[in-house]
């Protein structure tokens, strides 16, 4: 969110002044590459995988293939942005949910169009895996396990099926 904020540079300077710590705001590509390195250092990923990092201001999709540099797509589809732009009621109305679905689908279709020419063969459900990282995904894993307190040992390498995600969505 900081990299897109109108007052982002001002905010960074204020934090640097108060803490004495230098801050570098990462580009979406840098964030994706670092997420990929972190995930692949801690997860036994197959030769080909897609890593997703749903942040507040953006979502990074990282296509990773053994021995090739990752292909990073940074999309302005963050959880905070989407909620602020589209949701007005709690729980969200069916119309709001539909609008969010449509917005996400359109953005993903646009972002993924160039991937067809990348050195990544078409996905194969039998061999490919989607790996989630960061807050939104770890929150889903915590909810699925009914954790009262975040425990990385319970979250890392946790397998969350599409059915379980759908079940969580219905509960929320």
Q: Across the structure, where does each feature detected by a protein language model lie?
A:
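A generic, well-ordered mixed alpha/beta core segment in the N-terminal half of proteins
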Residues: 48-58, 62
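Helical "lid/coupling" subdomains associated with nucleotide-phosphate turnover
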Residues: 1-48, 63-172
């Amino acid at each position: 969110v900081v990299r897109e904020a109108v007052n982002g540079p001002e905010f960074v300077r204020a934090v640097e002044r108060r803490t004495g710590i230098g801050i570098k705001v990462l580009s979406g590509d840098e964030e994706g590459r670092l997420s990929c390195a972190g995930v692949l250092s801690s997860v036994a990923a197959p030769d080909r995988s897609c890593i997703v990092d749903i942040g507040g201001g953006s979502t990074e999709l990282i296509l990773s293939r053994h021995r090739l540099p990752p292909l990073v797509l940074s999309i302005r589809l963050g959880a905070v942005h989407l909620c602020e732009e589209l949701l007005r009621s709690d729980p969200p109305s069916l119309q709001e949910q539909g609008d969010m679905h449509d917005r996400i689908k359109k953005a993903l279709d646009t972002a993924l169009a160039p991937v067809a020419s990348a050195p990544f063969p078409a996905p194969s459900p039998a061999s490919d895996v989607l790996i989630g990282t960061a807050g939104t995904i770890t929150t889903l894993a915590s909810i699925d396990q009914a954790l009262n307190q975040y425990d990385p040992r319970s979250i890392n390498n946790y397998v969350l099926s599409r059915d379980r995600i759908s079940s969580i969505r219905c509960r929320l």
